[in-house]
Regions:
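Amphipathic alpha-helical interface elements that mediate macromolecular binding in regulatory proteins
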Residues: 2, 22, 42, 46, ...
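Cyclophilin-like peptidyl-prolyl cis-trans isomerases
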Residues: 12-14, 26-32, 52-266
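Cleavable N-terminal signal peptides of Sec/SRP-targeted secreted and luminal proteins
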Residues: 1-13
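Secreted, short cysteine-rich peptides and small extracellular cysteine-rich domains stabilized by multiple disulfide
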Residues: 20-52
Length: 266
């Protein structure tokens, strides 16, 4: 078990290296790293090559990981104050890896939804510090309209796939469900602490392999209590979710079908 899990101390020790705006890549391509060096150093250190992020976890770190990855681009906050000063939204990327070996049905279901664009414009509706950050079900959280095909897949249920090989610790992906068995659909959580009491109640189907610093930032957002849920006061939006494939050396490439879609879009 210890060989599969990074300790909280190890995760917190990793130096954060991330862009603070979704436009950083475009700004960097336009030469802003040189033209506007001070601003870009603070806002876009990753795109400007000022720092390097911690390497993504690979199979050498966790043998249960399969090759697929999902990159979530999220943003939150931002406002236009009464003084006329605009506060830009915060931005970050979280990379998910998957345990096909222990939860094959759940993993394939989630990846299918991502490939269909199901999590684009969805939200992280629950942020309970030290417990979970939960992604809303596809049918309930999206701002964009849904196709009939997506709606059909989103309401499909998956069986519980419990195992003793992993436990609910920070970074694990845990499938949401109702009280009855085998009722998971499309909502899932990223675990933010040690929650072993969830073992054998909710399916663990993967883990966060990159972007723990972004999760730590999310834990600092202002929240409100609604029933049993601790929810962010402002919407935390998933701008996009894309399936990629690990190259085994800390890098990612577009999955073949995603690459073909990008060609069509261009």
């Amino acid at each position: 078990m210890l060989s599969l899990l990074l300790s909280l101390a190890t995760l917190s020790a990793l130096k954060s290296c991330e862009d603070g705006n979704s436009q950083c890549g475009s700004w960097s391509d336009g030469g802003e790293c040189t033209k506007n060096a001070a601003f870009m150093k603070d806002t876009c250190p990753l795109s400007c090559g000022i720092c390097k992020p911690p390497p993504l976890l690979e199979q050498t770190d966790d043998p249960l990981l399969g090759p697929e990855r999902v990159v979530l681009q999220i943003q939150w906050g931002g406002s236009s104050g009464s003084s006329g000063v605009n506060v830009p939204p915060q931005y970050g990327e979280i990379v998910l890896g998957f345990y096909r070996e222990i939860a094959p049905v759940t993993v394939e279901h989630i990846l299918t939804l991502v490939r269909m664009g199901g999590y684009n414009t969805n939200e992280i509706f629950r942020v309970d510090r030290g417990f979970v950050a939960q992604i809303q079900g596809v049918e309930g959280g999206r701002r964009a309209p849904m196709s009939k095909a997506l709606r059909e897949v989103a309401k499909q249920t998956v069986p519980d796939e419990f195992t003793k090989r992993v436990s609910h610790t920070r970074g694990m992906l845990s499938m949401g469900k109702f009280d009855k068995p085998n009722t998971g659909t499309s909502s899932f959580s990223m675990v933010l602490g040690n929650a072993a009491f969830l073992d054998n109640k909710y399916t663990i189907f993967g883990r966060v392999v990159g972007g723990d610093a972004v999760l730590s930032k999310l834990e600092q957002v202002e929240t409100k209590k609604e029933g049993i849920f601790v929810m962010p006061k402002e919407r935390v939006e998933i701008v996009s979710a894309v399936v990629m494939v690990s190259d085994g050396n800390g890098g990612l490439r577009l999955e073949d079908c995603e690459a073909e879609k990008r060609k069509v879009e261009l």
